Swiss-Prot record:
Organism this protein belongs to: Chromohalobacter salexigens (strain ATCC BAA-138 / DSM 3043 / CIP 106854 / NCIMB 13768 / 1H11)
Catalytic activity: L-citrulline + L-aspartate + ATP = 2-(N(omega)-L-arginino)succinate + AMP + diphosphate + H(+)
GO biological process, alphabetically ordered: argininosuccinate metabolic process; L-arginine biosynthetic process; urea cycle
Gene3D superfamilies: Argininosuccinate synthetase, chain A, domain 2, HUPs, Single helix bin
Official protein name in the record: Argininosuccinate synthase
Alphabetical list of NCBIfam families matching this protein: argG, PRK00509.1
Ligand binding (L-citrulline): 88, 93, 124, 128, 180, 189, 265, 277
EC number assigned by the record: 6.3.4.5
Residues annotated to bind L-aspartate: 120, 124-125
GO-annotated cellular components: cytoplasm
Keywords on record: Amino-acid biosynthesis, Arginine biosynthesis, ATP-binding, Cytoplasm, Ligase, Nucleotide-binding
Entry's family note: Belongs to the argininosuccinate synthase family. Type 1 subfamily.
């Protein structure tokens, strides 16, 4: 352990990572550098500075990464219409590559020997952080305290704080939160507590970002989203930065009861886990993006893209953002977005986000051909006869050989 002189820790300022600071100092006799990222978790990050200073930390990094997070990670993911196992919008998964990248960069800047994180040994995040770190810095040493220490309960962590004079607000810490929560600009997640029973309904007061659909306004909210190369660049005609887009859609969606999700998912480490999520802005973005693609993408390109999406989602969920396969898939996905431009009109009402209009100068929708009225010869319906016969040829041959379908 003596070879570790300096460690960069992903630090939230909470109970677990505050204990980790002191544990690293004592166990490894090393200097600790803390890194706190603001990725839109909705909490003040500056208090983490005072807490780190109280623990004797000299080098403290606190960074606003909201714009980089949405622009370089969330937006590329949404170009693929990414969902994991049919429902999950990957709000936690997509936040980890950026944090891993900055941990490695800060380690390089400060001459640190190792990086550390507070992810447990049961979850996916340990995998995501460490796969990212090894992809970016192959020789990096990673210290994962939850896989080393015996502080395996909240009570033990709090006792450790008392024994080592770690500044934690015990007036709130002794009241065990019923849920383990994680938030960023894309979503907030809830796990643990009563959610460990997959039959138990989540309590209404758990949800923090949205009103219940029943309590949402009686009048719908309409919003127009402008796309440029697959990314939303304006809301109701007002140009906005990516993180501003997501922040505003979160508010609009939450006010209308949109984006709640309760699922059991398959973790990469092998177990099933029940989680509840609120992704109001992301839910709106996904439906709007699919709508503008329906107007502008070629059919076969769209269908192939849909086939690639589950693999792309799995790659991100499992922590392989920095892998060759993710970069290859991203290149293919991005190549489809050149003409994904236009405006989508959405109706937000009591938990639903409904597309009610879409338009684009690159639209492949031709009303003169698609019309049910007189098309003035734009489409000769007689051509369909030969098309059908050619496509039925293999079926007719098989049937003629006695291979009738059951």
């Amino acid at each position: 352990m003596s070879d570790v002189k300096k460690v960069v820790l992903a630090y939230s300022g909470g109970l677990d990572t505050s204990v980790i600071v002191k544990w690293l100092q004592e166990t490894y006799d090393c200097e600790v550098v803390t890194f706190t990222a603001d990725i839109g978790q909705g909490e003040e990050v500056e208090p983490a500075r005072a807490k780190a200073q109280a623990l004797g930390v000299k080098e403290i990094y606190i960074e606003d990464l909201r714009e980089e997070f949405v622009r370089d990670y969330v937006y590329p993911m949404f170009r693929a219409n990414t969902i994991y196992e049919g429902e999950y919008l990957l709000g936690t998964s997509i936040a980890r590559p950026l944090i891993a990248k900055r941990l490695v960069e800060i380690a390089n800047e400060t001459g640190a020997d190792a990086i550390s994180h507070g992810a447990t040994g049961k979850g996916n995040d340990q995998v995501r952080f460490e796969l990212g770190a090894y992809a970016l810095k192959p020789g990096v040493k990673v210290i994962a305290p939850w896989r080393e220490w015996d502080l395996n309960s909240r009570e033990k962590l709090m006792n450790y704080c008392e024994e080592h004079d770690i500044p934690v607000d015990f007036s709130t810490s002794k009241k065990k939160s019923p849920y383990s929560m994680d938030a960023n600009l894309l979503h907030i997640s809830y796990e643990g507590g009563i959610l460990e029973d997959p039959w138990a309904e989540a309590e209404e007061d758990m949800w923090r970002w949205s009103v219940s659909p029943e309590a949402a306004p009686e009048q719908p909210t309409y919003v127009e989203l402008t796309f440029d190369k697959g990314d939303i660049v304006a809301i109701d005609g007002e140009p906005l930065k990516p993180h501003e887009v997501l922040s505003r859609l979160n508010r609009m969606g939450g006010d209308n009861g949109i984006g709640r999700l309760d699922i059991v998912e398959n973790r990469y480490v092998g177990m099933k886990s029940r989680g509840c999520y609120e992704t109001p802005g992301g839910t709106i973005m996904l439906r709007a993006h699919r709508a503008i693609e329906s107007l502008t993408l070629d059919r076969e390109a769209a269908h192939l893209k849909d086939e690639l999406m589950p693999k792309y989602a799995e790659v991100i969920y499992n922590g392989y953002w920095w892998s060759p396969e993710r970069k290859m898939l991203q290149a293919a996905i991005d190549a489809t977005q050149d003409n994904v431009n236009g405006v989508v009109r959405m109706k937000l009402y009591k938990g639903s986000a409904t597309v009610v209009g879409r338009k684009s100068e690159q639209s492949l929708f031709d009303a003169s051909i698609a019309t049910f009225e007189d098309d003035a010869g734009a489409y000769d319906q007689k051509d369909a006869e030969g098309f059908i016969k050619l496509n039925a040829l293999r079926l007719r041959i098989a049937a003629g050989k006695g291979r009738q379908a059951d």
